Every structure is written in structure tokens, then in C-alpha cells.
């Protein structure tokens, strides 16, 4: 399993390598950041982009550390990804969800794959389109089962479309993304999958907008619709306002103010998000 020291070591290795291990040629910021589920995107929404800066015939790798702290809970994520030919993305992530007010923790492992179907982010008439899969499995099914979840693992599938519009607002470039996801996950999987009365997939929408203030600095907004399947507590949609700084092609930092709504009966869960990613 991915531990904090493992991800930290990977990021340090990436920064010290100075890109010596991988030749990459994509434009800075076009690989996005790493989401809390490990795939390329913003913070809570996967985009159609492929992580890192590998173009055709190239490869790249990333490692990330993420922390989200809201009123009664905190989430820690470590992960890594591999991109090949600007078409395939493979990712892994380990989530640890601390129940700060209740005591204890939940966790899950996520393995993801993404494939570019068509289009380009920058220089094509149609947006970049990707198909993604995320297999998730909780560490301990005791609490999810107690609150009514049906399964301890599940598979999310999504289609994402991303496009960068040049000189869109006050001469600045604007990235728009739309994602449609089929999922059974409760609280992105931390509370299991489905419920004892309905184990069917739910269709949800996720969207992002990012305005590039400079070539390597962006502000944006994300919205993630959530299924509401467990009777013991309402599950609200998520949203955030973020600032992303792509220091160079090997280091990026994303911070955000997040509104996660009601989680496990605790209302108005709001707080801060920070993520650091190193890329080869």
C-alpha cells in the first residue's frame, strides 16, 4: 500500500531528477493536476486530459500528496500515475478518511485507467474526449455495512470532455470540462457501494472551469454531483474554488476552499484542500 513516506520519496526523486528520466513536450499546465482519486483533473473532478507532460511517443509519471480538512473530517491521499503516448493513463491512490469528531478512520484503495478517445485539448475542432475506469475497494467494510452499503468494492466509469478556449475572457485562456460518471459509490466509495435495497448504477454530472491568469497560474471552480443512496444520512453534492500553480513541468501546487455539504449526518462540511504533485 502507498504510505506517506513512499509518495514523499517519489516526489523528491522526481524533483531531483530534473526531468532526466523522461522526455516530455506538452505545454505546461495541460496535464492538469491529480484528483483525490488519482486521475488527472482538478481536485475533485477528473478531466479529459492525460496526467503529466508526455506527448505522442513519450511517457511521463507523477506522484502526489493531498490533504483535505473540513469541520469534522479530514482526508489524506497519496498516489501516483503513469502516462503513455498522451493516450493512456494508469493511476493508483490510497485514501485515508479520518473521523475527527467520532474517532477512527475509513480508507480505500483506487486503481484507475483512462484512455483518450478523440480530439485534443488545444488544437482541434472537437474537445479532448476520454473514457475512464476507477476500481475502488474499502479497507474495512464494518462501518459501511452498518450504515446500509451493499458492497465493499465497486467500479466507476466516466466519460470526460475538456477544451481550452484561447483569449476567452479578458485575453485569458479558459479551460472547460464536463464529466458524466456511472457510479454506485457512497461518499466516493469510503462508505461502500450501493445499498441493500438498490444496487443499481447512478448517473451523475461533474464540471470544471479554469481561467489561466498566466501560463502557469489558474483559478477555477469545480462541481461534483453525488448519488444519495444511504437512508441514514443525506449525501450532498461537492464543490470547490481552487488556485493552481504549475511551478514548472516537474512541480505543481493546488489549494482550494471546499464545500462538501453533509457527510454522515454532519452538516456544512467546509474547509481547505491542498495538493502537491511531482512529475517526470
Annotated model-derived regions:
Residues 1-33:
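Cleavable N-terminal export/targeting peptides
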Residues 7-9, 118, 167, 185:
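General helical structural elements
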Residues 17-19, 80, 171-172:
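Short, flexible coil/linker elements and helix-boundary hinge sites characteristic
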Residues 23-168, 213-217, 227-229, 234, ...:
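Transmembrane beta-barrel domains of Gram-negative outer membranes and organellar outer membranes
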Residues 149-229, 237-238:
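Detector for outer-membrane/organellar transmembrane beta-barrel domains
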Residues 240-280:
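C-terminal appended segment following the main domain
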